[in-house]
């Protein structure tokens, strides 16, 4: 199996302690892939002489150059974190905080639900920008350690991070403006349509026109057309009182927003849930020692609903790709899945429960299965929806009547009526789409919810099977627990750190010999 080499270039302080004439300093590390192919791995350090050690296959990581650490992790002096996708950077930093700012790649991948490669790239970039440093354990594991104020340092360097809050606020303002504009357009359309209808009816008779103009100053009909927003009070006189009460409670939406909600909905209820799904899966695998059966992950994945396809474990392939997993056979021929990258952690806070029969008790601190939320047609209340539909119908009726009057008009319109005739196609599109779009959405939501319900039922079926496993499944789960390995890398196991001078670390040759002998005996 091929080895992957990683370069660590030490601090420039090392050149100040009289080591420039010495032979290259070597740290021998195994790649994440090779590390688990051999029973143990060794670390070799050479200062004035080279020490050769025995039969263990080892990949070489050279720290021969003592020029400067910035050459290794700060190429070009750029802000490396700006090259990361925003969600990857945020999830990686959240994972770093959760783990106490001392992490392995597996810690960040499992806590953040990131791909192993994404987690490694993010850690390298953030460490480069925040004066983070590396630690190497006695088994060759590389840990990333960040200062307490690393977020402040990163924000001070990155213009992108500084303007992100303003961009998010601007995006929210644009979204709210779009909602308000569409609702306001309904009121404006009603005002324009019915004002035009009145003007066209008035122009039919020169004699009645003057009388109707006088009449409009005194009767209530004119107020109805010129100010149709009064319909809000006619339909629901307590609307604004209820709206104010809901706003005080921190919930609900105003009428203008409810128009947009009725037509276009309120967005995907499962937005961001994929990230949560991968976080659940990563933390589950880590808590089980990095070895699981496919049946254990089925409650969190998109599994087949048919019983004939339940034996097909291809649904676990996305997990293997994301977390660098590989299938292994136990002594009984069961296929189990091992995730070496998630077996090494710098945090010993997560506890692992032994399997005692009840899977639901065993995962009491986690979600039992991944449940997707169903789509809602609209979050508006029944009364708000009725008001929106009523005003939409009033607008549609007015547009139809206006079309008839415009076609029957014998004289050439002028002024306001010319403007209305020019924008009439837009009024038609608005009035028609006001009901066409919700109708299409209703059928689409019904189909999506049926699919979501089927997926949730399939996951629940696997979860119930784990709650009361048969003998074969029980033996498979116990075998996975026997194969599980979890190594907590404490500070007592650190043999090298890039934040200290080499002479300060001053490991004696006898100490190294003792450690290697212990490793050989354990083999």
From Swiss-Prot:
Choose one Gene Ontology CC annotation of this protein and give it.
plastid
Q: According to Swiss-Prot or TrEMBL, what is its membrane topology?
A: Multi-pass membrane protein
Give the superkingdom in one word: Eukaryota
Q: Which UniProt keywords apply?
A: Chloroplast, Membrane, Plastid, Transit peptide, Transmembrane, Transmembrane helix
- What transmembrane ranges does the database entry give? 180-200, 386-406, 423-443
Species of the source: Arabidopsis thaliana (Mouse-ear cress)
* Transit peptide start and end: 1-63
Q: Where in the cell is it found?
A: Plastid, Chloroplast membrane
**Name of the protein in its database record:** Uncharacterized protein At5g03900, chloroplastic
Under InterPro entries, the record lists:
At5g03900-like
